[in-house]
A protein has these predicted regions:
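Single conserved hydrophobic/aromatic residue that forms the stacking wall/gate
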Residues: 1-10, 14
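N-terminal glycine-rich "phosphate-gripper" loop used for MgATP/nucleotide binding
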Residues: 15-19
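Rossmann-fold NAD(P) dinucleotide-binding segment
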Residues: 21-37
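Rossmann-fold NAD(P)-binding glycine/threonine-rich loop
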Residues: 39-79
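Short beta-strand->loop
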Residues: 82, 86-89
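Active-site-lining helix/loop region of Rossmann-like oxidoreductase modules
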Residues: 93-219, 242-249
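FAD-binding beta-loop-beta segment adjacent to the flavin cofactor pocket
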Residues: 220-247
């Protein structure tokens, strides 16, 4: 029995499996083991939200409170206090890394955040070729999940924690003709008196001890090729033609 084997031999279990499986395993593991889940089973903090976005009932609701939604650079030492470490989705990782520090510091306006994200087709899962069988996957750029992509739920949940629910954010993902990598372009309005240099400085200070997040020089043009096949994330802050508005580019492999 797989669950008995885990309980007997493991202190830590890392699961990269379809949504739903980690819920079942968590029922048997948590007395002596820590579960790191790469799927979405414990990303949302309410069973009702999981049902809404993933169209299936959560089978381990009592274990949700034992889990933490963990971007390591954000949660830091907090993960030691939880038995389930829930890894964020790919898009939310590229979006929350720049936004959380800037919102916490009160540097940006929260009522008009626009996010345009592009991902390699590996992010669409193993069934991507069947799903897009009528399209030329390698010669096409496709928007999908417009307005209602599942990752909206994670992004909204984590932003609400630091804004008390007062924000407006639009997120649109796109599938690109490359295998892997993400580039998220985030359009942000600055608070009065805040400059591009202030943004870069605050991000640099926030991530100065984090080896995988690099804040680039202002107006640096970025490419997914800069981080491909690494664990790195690059953040670039660029001016726009409008006063008090910046464009933040984020790439992750």
């Amino acid at each position: 029995d797989l669950h008995k084997e885990y309980r007997r031999q493991r202190q830590m279990c890392i699961r990269d499996s379809p949504n739903g499986e980690a819920q079942e395993i968590s029922k048997h593991l948590l007395k002596k083991n820590t579960l790191i889940d790469l799927a979405a089973d414990f990303r949302l903090k309410k069973g009702s939200d999981y049902l809404k976005w993933y169209k299936q009932k959560h089978k381990a609701v009592s274990n949700i409170k034992k889990s933490i939604y963990s971007l390591p650079e954000i949660t830091n030492e907090q993960i030691k206090n939880y038995k389930i470490i829930s890894c964020p989705g790919c898009y939310p990782t590229s979006i929350l890394l720049p936004l959380i520090p800037l919102i916490k510091k009160g540097l940006i306006k929260k009522d008009n955040i626009i996010i345009d994200s592009k991902s390699g087709y590996s992010g669409a899962g193993r069934g991507v070729h069947k799903k897009y069988k009528d399209k030329n996957l390698y010669e096409s750029l496709s928007a999908y999940g417009v307005g209602f992509h599942r990752h909206n739920s994670e992004i909204d949940q984590e932003i609400k924690k630091i804004t008390k629910g007062k924000f407006k954010l639009i997120f649109t993902p796109h599938l690109t003709p490359m295998f892997r990598g993400i580039l998220s372009t985030i359009y942000i309005d600055l608070e009065n008196g805040v400059t591009q240099s202030n943004i870069i400085k605050k991000l640099s200070i926030f991530y100065k001890k984090d080896n995988f997040v690099k804040i680039l020089k202002q107006n640096t043009l970025i490419s997914t090729n800069d981080v491909i096949n690494t664990n790195n994330c690059h953040i670039s802050v660029c001016k726009s033609k409008y006063k008090n508005k910046i464009v933040t580019g984020v790439i992750a492999s």
